Amino acid sequence: MHVRVRLFAMQRELAATREVALELEPGATIESAWDALVGLNPLLGPGRAAVRFARNGAYADATDVLEEGDELAFIPPVSGGAPDSEDTPGRDTRSGAGAARRIIELRATAFGPAILDDLADRLATPADGAVVAFLGRTRETPGTPAPGQEVEARRHAGRAVDELEYEAHETMALAVLGTIADEIAARFGVQRLAIVHRLGAVPLGEASIAVVAVSPHRDAAFGAARYAIDETKARAPIWKAERFEDGHVWVGAPARTGPADVEG
């Protein structure tokens, strides 16, 4: 049985390749595919505790049995972590909460200065009285290194970040963002939402993510925007490297494969 493994971020660097073809016995599981990969690339082995699995573009369990031609991704720690608040504002169930509109994008080019206004204009209807927008920017202060990156982080301790660089499993990332939008509609009743994320190099002070939630009422819009950014950072297969003059550090935490209050 033949399967294809795609490698990203720190795994890609450790293995010095973006893709590996594996030949496995019939009935092999995702876990056994990981073991075979580590057999070919032993440097990947210490990262097992922080790895999450994906099969054909969706999160999967280590015990899932593989089929001929499957595409696997062993997801290293993603760009963010779990939310720092468990507040859950109310759901918008009042009139005018319909008319679903979504903007889910990954962009390789810089955002314009009016991106939040542009997104709000594309989403809002006459029934909407609330627009909540979030813009994430590159800061000079380093973040928390991903598991396995601690030594490299210490080498750059005390230095300012020059720029960020983002990498993604693009088709899977778009699917995860769409799922997050579905959850927002179910939890908060917010049907008009934008999540736009940069890829590639993002210099100091430039924006890397824009989130806009539009609703008739503010409580639902605030909750939707917060949920969108927290879940994107925790679950989307998007990786972030902090770049310095003489090297880089991958930052983040092991990916969550579902909502924090459901994953168990």
Can you annotate each of these PLM segments?
Residues 1-87:
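Ubiquitin-like/PB1-type beta-grasp interaction modules and other compact soluble beta-rich domains
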Residues 4, 8, 12-14, 71-77, ...:
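N-terminal, polar/charged subdomain of small-to-medium soluble alpha/beta proteins
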Residues 29-32, 219-223:
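Short, conserved charged micro-motifs
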